[in-house]
Curated annotation (Swiss-Prot):
Organism ancestry: Bacteria, Bacillati, Bacillota, Bacilli, Lactobacillales
Subcellular location: Cytoplasm
Boundaries of every HTH LytTR-type domain copy: 142-246
Originating species: Streptococcus agalactiae serotype V (strain ATCC BAA-611 / 2603 V/R)
One Gene Ontology molecular-function label: phosphorelay response regulator activity
GO cellular component, one term: cytoplasm
Pfam families: LytTR, Response_reg
Protein name: Sensory transduction protein LytR
Gene: lytR
Length: 246
């Protein structure tokens, strides 16, 4: 797979290149780097790039400028936006991006993006790929209002939501946010069948379960992909078993 990383910061390019090279999702990736759109265009002209990691805020340019030009190529690459800003998510998916990852980059999150790219690259026609890429209408986003700002997170990136002492903690694959909301508020926005309540104060993303262990009183302990651990309440065991093949 030929991958182009466009970022005006050399450290960010090197960091992302390192994570891609060490990912289990791609074999022997051929990685190209560019610090501006002009340099990226030269690489795109010479190479048939399969994937571009695209920063949004470049020194004097905007990554969306290049993203909008890619559709003119005979074989446009898939796009993953890689940025320090969390307020461009909706616009990113409007431009048919496969994923949207945040700085500082983490191996697990890069792996998730590459896994999506790998699945899309196995599709045979352009129309298949276009239908598989999330569109604005189908991308589930959740706005979390913090004390100093609001952040937008993708529901699929949420690991769990739990309530303690009147505060709701929402854990994603990258960060944890605490807001003044109830668990019912989150449940009303969580999309089935991915989210399931496993305790009176906890809802988890089923796709983020990494390991299941026996627990006290014939219950279970869920180990999530980000390392968090959540006990399953006895009254929720039946519902969990119905959603999992055990």
């Amino acid at each position: 797979m030929k991958i182009l990383i466009l970022d005006d910061e050399m450290f960010a390019r090197q960091e992302l290149s390192f994570l891609v090279e060490h990912s289990q999702e791609v074999d022997n990736p051929e990685i190209f780097q560019a610090e501006d759109i002009s340099e990226a265009e030269k690489i795109l002209f010479r190479q048939q790039i399969d994937l571009i990691f695209l920063d949004i805020s470049l020194s004097e340019e905007n990554g969306f400028t290049l993203a909008n030009q890619l559709s003119q190529l005979a074989h446009p690459p898939l796009v993953v936006f890689a940025t320090a800003y969390d307020n461009y998510a909706v616009k990113a998916f409007e431009s048919n991006a496969v994923d949207y990852i945040m700085k500082p980059f983490e191996q697990q999150r890069v792996d998730m993006a590459l896994s999506k790219v790998k699945k899309l690259s196995q599709l045979t026609t352009a129309s298949d790929v276009e239908q598989a890429i999330p569109k604005k209408a189908s991308v589930e986003l959740l706005t979390l209002t913090l004390s100093d700002r609001s952040v937008v997170v993708k529901m699929q990136d949420i690991v769990a939501a739990s309530v303690e002492d009147g505060e709701l903690t929402v854990s994603t694959v990258q960060k944890t946010y605490t807001i003044r909301k109830t668990l019912n508020w989150f449940k009303s926005r969580a999309v089935a069948p991915y989210f399931l309540q496993i305790h009176r104060n906890t809802v988890i993303n089923l796709e983020m379960i990494e390991e299941i262990q026996p627990w006290f009183n014939h219950t279970l302990l869920l180990i999530m992909s980000n390392g968090e651990k959540f006990p399953v309440g006895r009254s929720y065991l039946k519902d969990l078993n119905e959603h999992l093949t055990m």
